[in-house]
Swiss-Prot record:
Disulphide linkage map: none
The encoding gene: tpiA
UniProt cross-references to PROSITE patterns, sorted A to Z: TIM_1, TIM_2
Catalysis performed (reactions): D-glyceraldehyde 3-phosphate = dihydroxyacetone phosphate
Protein's pathway: Carbohydrate biosynthesis; gluconeogenesis; Carbohydrate degradation; glycolysis; D-glyceraldehyde 3-phosphate from glycerone phosphate: step 1/1
One family name in Pfam for this protein: TIM
Organism the protein comes from: Streptococcus pyogenes serotype M1
Keywords in alphabetical order: Cytoplasm, Gluconeogenesis, Glycolysis, Isomerase
Official protein name in the record: Triosephosphate isomerase
Binding residue positions for substrate: 10-12, 174, 214, 235-236
Catalytic residues as annotated in Swiss-Prot or TrEMBL: 96 (electrophile), 168 (proton acceptor)
Compartments, record wording: Cytoplasm
Lineage, broadest ranks: Bacteria, Bacillati, Bacillota, Bacilli, Lactobacillales
Length: 252
């Protein structure tokens, strides 16, 4: 079945509110119709108000880069999914390897966050991916499959069909190394196969799976040609308006 592609830029810890506003103003009017593709940027928490406001009359969607799994309470430094929804965010990125690595987030944390995000009417972009060591040991499919199963445990079939999964091999994030077209296809298919095993083929056929890891305008077309790659989660190439817009050339 045909799935609408989704291209999402992850700014990580970059841009102040003025830079975020300038970026949105530079890209918003040049984006293609939402009939063709969904386009989003994941802004740092300090930029979300500005980014959402700047994007509100355009087709650009806005993601938070993380949230907590409780709506309110004594959780210093955390971001409420309820407040993200009230602010007008569309997506929340969870489970990014940098969060898992630097902030010791577990599969259980990510599962709780996914449930909290859905409870507040937002859509999770759930990241998964293996280290170079796991990849070289030939255990990538097994490892990533376990991450996906754990992250989605207890969600409904309808919820899983509507979310986005982002496969990002850790060894390709910000390293300039990128997975081959075959690697990306095989792993995104493996992710989809896990969804099929856990929730049925119909759900697996609907869920969108992105590839991420050193995606740039020069290679995005190759990845998007893969039958099981439905989009890209893009870091460095999403920081400049021109390179971000160039990622959408795969549509031509």
């Amino acid at each position: 079945m045909s799935r609408k592609p989704i291209i999402a830029g992850n700014w990580k810890m970059n841009k102040n509110p003025q830079e975020a506003k300038a970026f949105v103003e530079a890209v918003a009017s040049k984006l293609p119709s939402t009939d063709l593709v969904d386009v989003a940027v994941a802004a740092p928490a300090v930029d979300l108000v500005t980014t959402i406001e700047a994007a509100k009359d355009s087709v650009l969607k806005v993601a938070a880069q993380n949230c907590y799994f409780e709506n309110t309470g004594a959780f210093t430094g955390e971001t409420s999914p309820k407040v993200l929804a009230e602010m007008g965010a569309d997506y929340v990125v969870i489970g990014h390897s940098e969060r898992r690595d630097y902030f010791h987030e577990t599969d259980e944390d990510i599962n709780k966050k996914a449930k909290a995000i859905f409870a507040n009417g937002l859509t999770p972009i759930v990241c998964c991916g293996e280290s170079l060591e796991t990849y070289e040991a030939g255990k990538a499919v097994e490892f990533v499959g376990a991450q996906v199963s754990a992250a989605l445990a207890g969600l409904s079939a309808e919820q899983v069909a509507s979310l986005v999964l982002a496969y990002e091999p850790i060894w390709a994030i910000g390293t300039g190394k990128s997975a081959t077209q075959d690697d990306a296809q095989n792993m995104c298919k493996a992710v989809r196969d896990v969804v099929a095993a856990d929730f049925g083929q119909e759900v697996a056929d609907k869920v969108r799976v992105q590839y991420g890891g050193s995606v740039k305008p020069e290679n995005v077309k190759d990845y998007m040609a893969c039958p099981d790659v439905d989009g890209a989660l893009v870091g460095g190439a999403s920081l400049e308006a021109d390179s971000f817009l160039a990622l959408l050339d795969f549509l031509n």
